[in-house]
Structures are given as structure tokens and as C-alpha cells.
């Protein structure tokens, strides 16, 4: 036992001494650097946080030969992984996203890896967006609608050579290629997944077979791979009156027209629903129509009472034919039997939806018994019936296509006055519907209802195929196109179809070569705002590169001390 302990102490003493000396040296260096970086001048606040790519490369390039044993190697590897993934800040989903992104970049062709290294996307979605924009840029260099798929990308990848660099690539691409071309180091086994820019083989020359193979690996021959990527990409162009709400607005307008047709059925029981679906301006218009209807009812009820009065007088002449009770029922309406506007009415006699109060005889105590409540106004085009002539007039606009209500600001016309009132809020900026939870305001009540589902977590629209739920019916419709393969949005230039209108808008910029998003620093333009945001990181890294590697190491040591 003593011999084993002595041998263990003897065998480990040199290593322990080296470890101790190494720790002391590292500690002194860290303290000196911390004093230099975090000391009296407080220059830390001006130092930007280091790029996570630096820690990732340190983790991937770590070698066992640089340690004194397996335990120290494992400990150092954990430390480097901790600095890269930062589990004290990032969630599990974010850490998984980083790992998936790294693997996704590693399976891309070499030339695309070099290009993406300039942008360093933070997620797989950002990488996909960049690749889609790359295809748009490369497609824009060709004659629109003539070249697609592998042939298009193969032609576009030729300018990746530093000598023939294309203007559609980043301004720093030439420097990256030059630095990479002169590098003589070869990647180790542990580096094969990371594929840093300094270890990726040089891109092929023009017309090489490898270039064609790379293009075929990314895009299939029938150009369907790009569509799959589009299905995974996030919806990019979302506006309050954008394409996502188009179907919902049309449906809402149709529902309003149908509600007008069902207003006043059997006495007008659906009045409350109509009041919710129409605007204040249209309500005033309806009130006038209701007043006319009420006047017509009063006239008919008065004639009915006169007829009943005469009948009662005739019946009173023959008392032997009826009992006293029957005489009272068939007699003229008295003050007790008659409900007027000044008197109190029972709940069954208030007549929802009649607009104005009017007197009713005892023989017509409920709205269901009103004889004029039938749908007497019929549409000649489709045969649909309505209880009011005003509802029929509104309905006929569907067939005639008439849009009498025009906006004075932009000239846009509408078939209903209520739709014009809602549209004018775009110009006035009025947002009367406010969320009680966060205070955010909306111009449409329907948008407020959709917003409140964010707080409640309600997702009432579920896919029958996969069970995935959505908070908006339009999102469910878009999702179901993945199962059905429907692509209703077709390009008029080249005939290519898409399952979302936003994708068609982006695709049209290939033909128009429109790039509305421009960088204010270097003047480079992009087709998407998200790509411009990623481009800004290049300028941010230029500012960060002004700091020495020692400052970045000191910052990493500071992060470690804060854990």
C-alpha cells in the first residue's frame, strides 16, 4: 500500500508541479490583462463583446496534445464549450439551434460555406434567407425566366473565384478568399465539422466539373428544393393590410352583407350581431331605415286595430254567441291592452332590431307575430330574400360591382360605407381598439382579437393532417398547402408558382431587379430587409476587429469570472 502511494506520488509530482506552475502563470497573465483592460481607465465599456465564432473555433480546434492529461483535456474542453454555448444565458432551444446551424453549414458546398462565413448567421433560418437571396442575386444576372435550377447556380458560382469576383457578393469576399488561398494549414479531424473560413479549400475555376456537382447538390433538377426551403422560411412581409389578412377581410365583408340579409328575421332577433359587425356611420344609416319600417308597422297596426274595433262592435250586438271573456278579447284595444312608447314594455314586447319604439296592440305582443317581418324583398340575380329594401340594395352591389364610396385621400373605392370608414383610419392613424394587457392599439377590432390570442395562448385552428394548431385561420390555410401541395400564386413572367403571396413578391424582384433595402454605410442594396440586417454585422465586426486578441481573451476571462 505504501509502495503504491509512493509510486503515485512520484509519478504525478512532476505533472502536478507543471500544472501548478501553469496555473500560476495563467493567473498572472489574466490578472495583468484584467488590470490593463478593466482597470483605472474603465475601457471595458467601450469594448464590444467578442464574436461567438471565436469561441466556437477555439472549441473545435482544441487539441489533446496541448494538455497534460485526459482529465485536464476534458476540463478544458468543457470550459471552451461553455464559453461558446453560454448555457447561463442561452436556452436549450437556442443551444440546439447553434448546433444545428453548425451542422447545416458543414453540409453545404465549400463555396457557399465561404460566402456564409462573411455573414455568420445566428440561426438556420437566417442561413436559409441568405441562400435564397443569393439565388435571387444570381438569377438577376441572367435573362429573366430562362435559367433555373442547377444550371443557374452553376453559372452564378463561377464568379466565386477571387479573380472574377461578382458584384453581387459581399465587399469583403475578396479579402477572405485571398487569406484563405494563401493558408497552408490542413484541417484536423475535429475541425471537419466547423469548417472555418481559413481551412476551406479554394473554389474551383470556371467550368470545372466540381462546380456543377456542387450546384446539383444544393438544387434538384426540377428546382423543387428551393420551394421546400421557401416553405421553411419565415413570412417576411407582414403589414396590417398585407397579404396575410386579405382573405380574412373579404370574409368579414361577406359576413356583413349576409348579416344585413338576416337582420330583422322573424322580428329581428339578430340585431345585436349586426350592430357588432357594422360601423357607427352605417348604424346611423340603418336607424333611418328602421324608422321607416317602424312607421309602416304603426300604420298597419292602426288599420288592424280599427278593423278589430268594428268587429268587436258587431260581436257585441250578439251577446248570446260569445261569453263575456270572448267579448273582452275581441273588443277594441283599450289603454291597458295597448303598449305605447311612453309606457313600460315587457321583455317579450321590446322587439329587438326595430330601431324605434312604437305602439303594439295586445294581439301583437311579440316580434315573432309581426306580419311584415317576412322576407319580401327578393334578389332577381340569385333569388336571395331580405326583410328590408336597404339590405337588398346593399346585396345587389355584389352583382353589379358598384363601389360608390370613394376615399378622398387616395381615391380607393369601396362597396360599403363601413369599409370606407375602416380604410380612412390608415390615413388618420386612428387606432381606437386597445389591448388591456399591453396597451397596444389597433385600427380594427378583428386585429385586436387576433392580438389578444398572444396573451391567452389560444390556437383554435388545428390542422387535420398533423394536428398543428394556429391562432389565425389564414396561417392554417397557408400551412395546409404544405400537405396539399397547392401553389396558387403564379408568376406572370416565367410561370413559377408559390404557395405564399410574399414569396411571389420576392420572386418578382428577380425580373424587376428591385433592391429596395440599401445599406447607409457602403451603399450595397438587398432584396430583403432581413438580409440588410445580417449585412450590418459585417460593419460591426469591422469595428470589433480594431481590438487586439488580448482584449478578447480578457473579455472571455471576465465572463468566466462572472459565472
Curated annotation (Swiss-Prot):
The keyword Transcription applies. Keywords: DNA-binding, Isopeptide bond, Metal-binding, Nucleus, Phosphoprotein, Repeat, Transcription, Transcription regulation, Ubl conjugation, Zinc, Zinc-finger. The modification Phosphoserine is found at residues 13, 208. Residues 270-289, 297-352 have a biased composition (Basic and acidic residues). One of its GO terms (molecular function) is zinc ion binding. One of its GO terms (cellular component) is nucleus. Residues 227-300 form the KRAB domain. It is found in: Nucleus. The keyword Transmembrane does not apply. InterPro entries: KRAB, KRAB_dom_sf, SCAN_dom, SCAN_sf, Znf_C2H2_sf, Znf_C2H2_type. Residues 56-138 form the SCAN box domain. It comes from the Eukaryota. A zinc finger (C2H2-type) spans 377-399, 405-427, 433-455, 461-483, 489-511, 517-539. SMART domains: KRAB, SCAN, ZnF_C2H2. PANTHER family: KRUEPPEL-LIKE TRANSCRIPTION FACTOR, ZINC FINGER PROTEIN 384. May be involved in transcriptional regulation. This is Zinc finger protein with KRAB and SCAN domains 1. It comes from Pongo abelii. The gene is ZKSCAN1.
